């Protein structure tokens, strides 16, 4: 055989080998038929892990091996720009995979504590999970949190030890940790390298063998649950659904339980990992549905969709997905007040895709109309702001985050009944709602139970940080010979803003943590007020624990000094407590002065110095008059820079 033809055949053979798993099911002109997959041939599973344990990499390998994508693709399920920039998963994604005659519905989830709501929402449609642990890092705080989320929902858990080919991998140690913490036997654990693909085929076999089939009824009217949704500018709200009963296809009429509206289904399909149309979605399957939902309130997570022919009274709704309470609140305003309406629409549409965000209308004299928005953490807040910018081209001002406080009002005829409509306890979300201290019996601040995993030798350093954050020490448990699980009870105000960054810095990145709500505790709160030339600027006011007031006052005053330009008169910046004028921190911006010595050309003889002093005296008196009647010009950029974290 000629050498040239032989080389050509070898090249074609290699090409076939490299592409043998890749499917053309992503062709939008072809309809995928999933009718062969009855519930017993379906497995719905998720991947949960701590940050940077290889979750997205494992998802990529599974997609490759099942023919959903060509080899060599990275972060296929991390579709958002912010996810690729930061290297983290923010949004749970789904992908329908075929393997050995089974339909495997993969639900990828975030790993950061701020996005635990995404994990919880994804688990509502999973029958099993892969609990992924990196062999070089071991069990981390979020690993423990994710385990208990799945355990409480009675979901099958498959432990998978990843990164076994790294030099620092310690498989035996990780097996010991999994045994001590979760009672997994070593023979239950799979050992893989998601990066190289080593033993990933065993993961697919374990999913089929260990994960139970979904509980679903084919011979029944259509009923499904929305577990995620997002807004498309051309097709409206697109709902990701789990079909529990019956089937749905293009042309069917369906009804929404909450708003009682009837819709015509225009498209159904699955994610592979991009949208692929299919003939119908059947019981037990996970996919998407388009039915011309035009407002963000029509595709709410947890909503029940059912066949129009079914009586609404006979429909059993779903209760698997619970709302999540925000931990931090921040003001959100458009940079240009004229952009308010377009930003309002962007916020509503983004909240459809992120239902853990809460929105309350707000306003400011300096910044105009806006919102006070609740987030699950500071990273969640930063990602929300980045998505507004990247996906909706919105320019926004995100203010310094704060937590919710509460006040117990005195039981007094005048105070409680007349001033507070008889309420025994009020919520305080922003300084403008801060009550007069004479009206309050006590203030309450939210507490959290913090779980940290730290190396033995760093226990003292971490305990010192927690003591500094006004914490109460809890239990200490050894998970192996080198690491400890430490529990502390801390104020949420100390944890929500920069605790994780401080913890990583002190432990050189070796510590991990997660937290959960742990009730309320009496505290002393103050309203930190900023006065500029004796006038209060309400936009800079903050509610903080009294112990943090002096340090925060110094930071705010220094920031304002940098941001406010010099005026023709003296500007005094003071940080005070409440309505008091006694300064915790104060600074003076000196006025601009005219140099009269240049006008006199150095001619100080023959009465020149007397003339100079006279000019300076007149200037001083004039500036004092300006200070009494003048308004300090504060540029809008100052609000952005001072109120940011």
From Swiss-Prot:
Gene3D superfamilies: 3.30.70.240, Elongation factor 4, C-terminal domain, Elongation Factor G (Translational Gtpase), domain 3, P-loop containing nucleotide triphosphate hydrolases, Translation factors
Alphabetized GO MF terms: GTP binding; GTPase activity; mitochondrial ribosome binding
Note: This protein may be expected to contain an N-terminal transit peptide but none has been predicted.
GO cellular component annotations of the record: mitochondrial inner membrane; mitochondrial matrix; mitochondrion
Descriptive protein name: Translation factor GUF1 homolog, mitochondrial
Disulfide bond residue pairs: none
Species for this entry: Caenorhabditis elegans
Residues of the tr-type G domain: 40-215
């Amino acid at each position: 055989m000629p050498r040239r033809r032989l080389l050509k055949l070898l090249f074609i053979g290699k090409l076939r080998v490299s592409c043998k798993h890749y499917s053309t099911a992503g062709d939008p002109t072809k309809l995928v038929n999933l009718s062969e997959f009855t519930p017993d041939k379906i497995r719905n599973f998720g991947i949960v892990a701590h940050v940077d344990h290889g979750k997205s990499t494992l998802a990529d390998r599974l997609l490759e091996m099942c023919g959903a994508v060509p080899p060599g693709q990275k972060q296929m399920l991390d579709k958002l720009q912010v996810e690729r920039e930061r290297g983290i998963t923010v949004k749970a994604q789904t992908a329908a995979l075929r393997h050995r005659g089974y339909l495997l519905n993969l639900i990828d989830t975030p790993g950061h504590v701020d996005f635990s709501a995404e994990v919880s929402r994804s688990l509502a449609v999973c029958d099993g999970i892969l609990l992924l642990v990196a062999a070089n890092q071991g069990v981390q705080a979020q690993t423990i949190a994710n385990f208990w989320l799945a355990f409480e929902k009675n979901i099958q858990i498959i432990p998978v030890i990843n990164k076994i080919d790294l030099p620092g991998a310690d498989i035996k140690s990780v097996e010991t940790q999994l045994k001590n913490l979760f009672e997994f036997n070593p023979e239950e654990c799979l050992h893989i390298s998601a990066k190289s693909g080593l033993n990933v085929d065993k993961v697919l076999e374990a999913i089929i063998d260990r994960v139970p089939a979904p509980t679903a009824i084919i011979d029944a009217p259509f009923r499904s649950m929305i577990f995620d949704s997002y807004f498309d500018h051309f097709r409206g709200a697109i709902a990701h659904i789990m079909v529990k009963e019956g089937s749905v296809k293009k042309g069917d009429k369906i009804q929404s339980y909450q708003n009682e509206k009837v819709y015509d289904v225009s498209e159904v399909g699955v994610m592979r990992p991009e949208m692929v149309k299919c003939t119908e979605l059947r019981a037990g399957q996970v996919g998407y549905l388009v039915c011309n939902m035009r407002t963000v309130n029509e595709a709410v997570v947890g909503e029940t969709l059912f066949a129009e022919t079914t009586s609404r009274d006979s429909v059993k709704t779903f209760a698997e997905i619970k709302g999540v309470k925000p931990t931090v609140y921040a003001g959100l305003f458009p940079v240009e007040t004229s952009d308010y309406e377009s930003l309002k629409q962007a916020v509503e549409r983004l909240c459809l895709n992120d239902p853990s965000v809460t929105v309350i209308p707000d306003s400011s004299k300096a910044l105009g109309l806006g919102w006070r928005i609740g987030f699950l953490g500071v990273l969640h807040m930063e990602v929300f702001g980045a998505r507004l910018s990247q996906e909706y081209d919105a320019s926004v001002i995100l203010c310094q985050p704060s937590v919710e406080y509460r006040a117990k009002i005195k039981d007094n005829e005048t105070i409680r009944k007349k001033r507070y409509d008889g309420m025994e306890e009020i919520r305080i979300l922003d300084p403008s709602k801060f009550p007069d201290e004479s009206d309050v019996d006590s203030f309450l601040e939210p507490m959290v139970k913090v779980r940290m995993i730290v190396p033995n030798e760093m226990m003292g350093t971490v305990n010192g940080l927690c003591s500094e954050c006004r914490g109460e020490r809890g239990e200490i448990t050894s998970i192996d010979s080198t690491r400890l699980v430490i529990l502390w009870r801390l104020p949420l105000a100390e944890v929500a803003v920069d605790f994780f960054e401080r913890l990583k810095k002190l432990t050189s990145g070796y510590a991990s943590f997660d937290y959960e709500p742990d009730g309320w505790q009496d505290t002393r709160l103050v309203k930190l007020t900023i006065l500029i030339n004796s006038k209060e600027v309400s936009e800079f006011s903050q509610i903080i624990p009294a112990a943090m007031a002096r340090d925060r006052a110094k930071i705010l005053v220094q920031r304002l000094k940098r941001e406010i330009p010099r005026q023709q008169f003296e500007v005094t910046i003071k940080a005070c407590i409440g309505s008091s004028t006694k300064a915790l921190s104060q600074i003076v911006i000196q006025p601009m002065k005219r140099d009269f010595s240049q006008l006199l050309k150095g001619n100080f003889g023959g009465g020149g110095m007397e003339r100079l002093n006279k000019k300076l005296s007149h200037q001083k008196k004039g500036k004092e008059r300006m200070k009494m009647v003048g308004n300090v010009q504060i540029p809008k950029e100052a609000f952005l820079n001072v109120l940011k974290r």
